[in-house]
């Protein structure tokens, strides 16, 4: 089996690469940060093919997929993990550049990678597309605005993709985590570790390994089983009450 992972240089992506490589699965680990990828490849050995890829570059996606070595060329599982959140300001004060970057990465990047790899899966009559969504796509919160909307897109795209692929043998799963302690909050707050650490203060969040284990489980079900959606949260997280303005 061969697994293609985007955003594999850290967080969920690196954990997914490690989890599948532990089974002897071939892994194409793609990301922008080549130094991190080199370390991952050195750690995991010959079962990993590391390749530089910015999912916002459509031409690069086409080139990378076309130039995969023969032993990594037939992708069985695509894990669309690359994504980010930027800022937590209300919509009227949000930076449009941040919104554009989230849409370009979380939505357009995901569909471009999917479109590049999907024809091979359909031709072979097997495959699995695993998309990383978020509970933010279902449950709104102040400052979530564009980020939550991009993850709602991932959820709906996954369902429609499943409908399109009915009868092809290709499966589709949306994995939708809640609070997880990765670089997510550090990126959201532009490297401010104090703000990032405060997000998880006093509670036990999910880990990257928790999410990687969930993805691995979904992707290794028998071929007649399709896991449509998995929503997972830390036990300490639940659903916020509706907001009410008083006075």
Locate each region found by the language model.
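Conserved glycine-rich cofactor-binding loop
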Residues: 9-10
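Conserved glycine-rich Rossmann-like NAD(P)H-binding loop of the short-chain dehydrogenase/reductase
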Residues: 23-39
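The beta1-alpha1 cofactor-binding region of Rossmann-like NAD(H)/NADP(H)-dependent oxidoreductases
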Residues: 53-63, 96
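Substrate-binding pocket helix/loop in short-chain dehydrogenase/reductase
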Residues: 89-91, 95-103
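Active-site helix of classical SDR
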Residues: 114, 150
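Residue(s) in the substrate-gating loop at a strand-loop-helix junction
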Residues: 134
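C-terminal helical subdomain
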Residues: 174-178, 193-241
